UniProtKB/Swiss-Prot annotation:
Disulfide bonds: none annotated. InterPro entries: SDH5. It holds the Pfam family SDH5_plant. Pathway: Carbohydrate metabolism; tricarboxylic acid cycle. Residues 1-89 form a transit peptide. Component of complex II composed of eight subunits in plants: four classical SDH subunits SDH1, SDH2, SDH3 and SDH4 (a flavoprotein (FP), an iron-sulfur protein (IP), and a cytochrome b composed of a large and a small subunit.), as well as four subunits unknown in mitochondria from bacteria and heterotrophic eukaryotes. The keyword Membrane applies. One of its GO terms (cellular component) is nucleus. It comes from Arabidopsis thaliana. This is Succinate dehydrogenase subunit 5, mitochondrial. Transmembrane segments: none annotated. It comes from the Eukaryota. One of its GO terms (biological process) is tricarboxylic acid cycle.
Length: 257
């Protein structure tokens, strides 16, 4: 085995170690899901693994579950524009929730502007502080909770997508020199990952377009990287995008100001 081969093998071993540490989130790739509505008005997608199984080197224990993400189902945000205010293009499409508390608003802005592949600890701390503080801006806190839980789900699911890609790289080589048919477990993992991705995006309500676009931009790149490494995937993979649903006009980018 040459130097490059040993390096790839070492990377594969490290990734497998990481994958084993992610066993608690491995259930995203197996089983069915149902929608459970909580008193807090959050919608949580729960994925349950009916039988113990292994996806690559990720052990999925029987009955394991994960709170995949949650978004508000009944929060209605005002869309009316006041006299003399500037109306952005596609305002009705990507309207942001109104927030009165400055701490909640700043935490919301920082979270939407952060990289969800690995959430910065400072951003997480500020978000948790704003969510738990005593304030009259309950609607703002609910909106922040939705974004924070979505960010946590995207971070964990993105880690699984990365583990799948590394497993593929370890199997066929970084440059594809050992190209061969994918093992059935990886094929099943890819199929289930796309299903979870598509179902999650479809779950967003019209008033949550800003959050849907953020999720698409965070996970779309990882999904496309998987698509580029494999041939023969279904035509549905052509729908994966990193551009969001309606471009950037009125999107979270404006919240950085």
């Amino acid at each position: 085995m040459g130097t490059l081969g040993r390096a790839i093998h070492t990377v594969g071993n490290r990734i497998r170690g990481t994958a084993q540490a992610q066993a608690r989130v491995g259930s995203l790739l197996q089983g069915s899901h149902h929608i459970e509505k909580h008193l807090s008005r959050h919608r949580t997608l729960i994925t349950v693994a009916p039988n113990a199984s292994v996806i690559g080197d990720v052990q999925i224990n029987k009955g394991s579950f994960i709170s995949y993400a949650s978004v508000s189902r009944d929060l209605q945000y005002p869309r009316a524009m006041g006299m003399g205010q500037v109306r952005r293009f596609s305002e009705d499409v990507s309207h942001m929730p109104e927030m009165e508390d400055s701490d909640v608003l700043n935490a919301f802005k920082d979270l939407m502007a952060a990289d969800w592949a690995e959430l910065p600890s400072a951003v997480v701390k500020d978000a948790k502080t704003a969510i738990s503080k005593n304030t009259d801006d309950k609607a703002g806190q609910e909106a922040l909770k939705n974004v924070f839980r979505a960010a946590e789900a995207v971070e964990e699911f993105g880690g699984i997508l990365t583990s799948i890609k590394m497993e593929i790289d370890d199997s066929i080589g970084m440059s594809g020199e050992g190209v061969k048919p994918l093992p059935n477990d990886i094929t099943d993992a890819l199929r289930t990952a796309y299903q979870r991705y598509a179902e999650y995006l479809d779950s967003f309500e019209p008033e949550e377009v800003y959050l849907k676009k953020k999720v698409e931009m965070e996970l779309g790149t990882k999904m496309i990287h998987l698509k580029m490494r494999c041939s023969g995937l279904g035509s549905e993979w052509g729908k994966v995008t990193v551009l969001g649903t309606s471009g950037l006009s009125g999107s979270y980018v404006e919240q950085r100001a």
